[in-house]
């Protein structure tokens, strides 16, 4: 099996196994798995609104997954995406609520820049610690998730009462600040599809070009493969790691503001780290950190997310719906194990 075919087959096997495991669990508990999946796909694709919701869910997933991919290419396992996304959401939300009368083009541009900066700063901290102190990026980024979560919640509680709907939730941002637009809502049956999907598509093209066609992209890939050899070749591994984490965090921050101002249109206290951050990691892993592949992986995850409530029509309880989704994520997480058993033939012959 060629390397290219392997890169395609491994994610496909992961998805098929996840769907099969979900079906087996449903059958064990006496539910009709075929009916359940029919309802899932009907809910996702059976209406224009459902399709709009798929594209709505894709926006933040693609952006956050791209952030994970950039860090991974540099050899950095960025578990801090939920915190970086939340930083972008909270800071941009605060700005939008504080200056509601800002003209829409300027407001959108300002919230994008603020999200990029906030996410980039949160991403830079573990990058600096890894580059100069050799700290474990996994531990540091996990701790950063908690720091951003609780600092963000405290910051929201300090908002002026005029912009708060309740103790834990702000009012909606103004029409100038929301990423939803009337023409997209009308086009997609009043779904929450927003301009975030366009940001995501542009980001895919930019990140693909950066990784494949620029000096920085070459340096990121070189450091990810062998930082010591990169240093010997004149590439600063420390600088590259920090830059990759700034870019990774910035993309996650942009994903966060797309989720916040595109889906919810407000800011509120979070009980735990953003699930969309971890889902973005799974999307990138499923796509083997390929920018183009991330689009397709995010589409699959969005279909599952939008279609899952429809499985209740097949009398499948919500707990089993969650198991189906978790099964996909599980096999995505272990697809590297599958990859070990689907090696290219040339590698197998070399091993002999």
Language-model regions, residue ranges each:
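Cytosolic-side transmembrane-helix boundaries in multi-pass membrane proteins
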Residues: 1-17, 23-27, 225, 232, ...
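Transmembrane alpha-helical segments in multi-pass inner-membrane proteins
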Residues: 246-252, 256-326
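Transmembrane helix-bundle core of multi-pass membrane transporters
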Residues: 141, 145-211, 350-351
